[in-house]
């Protein structure tokens, strides 16, 4: 019999770090209808949107997130809370908040700030990132990252033209297939990675606030810097893991957002699914 604590241990670190997802910079619970509609110019000032996601493995819920986004003109302000749930909460008590700000510039969502704070057991941890013109100008982790040899250092060049894990997955595209024709440059405060997408079909998707077709992208995780070379979890994600992300278009906005992600881990497939994607007022 597999002990629950053994199952959760490989998952919980990234779950805590991103707050709502595991591994590879694929967290997207904070992606909001509000920010997406803002990017298309369709949202009015002070519109409020709410998104909710469930994270599960072996069919068991291990975490939840709830995000509210306020849109004012071209700017968005996102506030969310995430926590472990169900059986996972017995073995791994994580509770935290995330705050992201940014704006729509030239048809792209450009982040300004990313603030993550959470309590993992008895330990308080935080990550802050500041951006200017799409480049990272400051990043801090508390407590500081423990760099274990052989460590791949992050260079200044690595931090140009990147997004935080939440903003990276807001994608403007002419059609569903075009969503997958790209590579996403992501920085989470520690690790710089590329998420290379490729088209893998379509599927229908229904949740509270949305019904329609989604496009499935296969995703390949490519670590660039800010990680321990040879670490088993990183090697598995980059060389063996099977990952897909399903994106859905919001009306005629021309913006696509993830509604389902499946991430193969060493102990099973992690599933992240939107359970609500709607406007509040």
Where do the language-model regions lie?
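N-terminal secretory signal peptides that target proteins for export/translocation
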Residues: 1-19
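Sec-dependent N-terminal signal peptides
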Residues: 14-32
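Acidic, serine/threonine-rich low-complexity disordered tracts
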Residues: 44-133, 176-281
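A charged, solvent-exposed segment within the mature domains of Sec-exported extracytoplasmic proteins
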Residues: 137-200
């Amino acid at each position: 019999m597999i002990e629950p604590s053994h199952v959760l241990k490989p998952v919980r670190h990234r779950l805590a770090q991103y707050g709502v997802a595991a591994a590879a910079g694929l967290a997207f619970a904070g992606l909001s209808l509000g920010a997406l509609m803002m990017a298309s110019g369709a949202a009015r000032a002070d519109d409020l949107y709410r998104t909710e996601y469930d994270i599960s493995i072996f069919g068991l819920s291990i975490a939840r997130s709830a995000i509210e986004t306020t849109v004012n003109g071209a700017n968005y302000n996102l506030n969310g809370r995430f926590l472990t749930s169900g059986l996972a909460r017995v073995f791994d008590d994580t509770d935290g908040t995330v705050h992201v700000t940014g704006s729509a510039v030239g048809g792209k969502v450009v982040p300004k700030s990313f603030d993550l704070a959470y309590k993992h057991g008895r330990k308080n941890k935080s990550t802050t990132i500041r951006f200017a013109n799409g480049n990272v100008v400051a990043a801090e982790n508390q407590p500081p990252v423990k760099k274990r040899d052989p460590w791949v250092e992050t260079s200044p060049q690595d931090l140009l033209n990147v997004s935080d894990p939440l903003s990276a997955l807001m994608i403007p595209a002419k059609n569903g297939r075009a969503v997958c024709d790209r590579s996403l440059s992501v920085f989470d405060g520690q690790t710089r990675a590329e998420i290379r997408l490729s088209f893998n079909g379509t599927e229908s998707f229904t949740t509270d606030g949305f019904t329609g077709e989604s496009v499935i992208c296969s995703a390949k995780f490519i670590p660039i810097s800010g990680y321990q070379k040879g670490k088993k979890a990183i090697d598995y994600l980059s060389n063996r893991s099977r990952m897909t992300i399903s994106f859905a278009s919001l009306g005629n906005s021309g913006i696509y957002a993830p509604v389902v992600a499946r991430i193969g881990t060493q102990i099973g497939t992690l599933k992240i699914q939107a359970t609500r994607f709607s406007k509040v007022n």
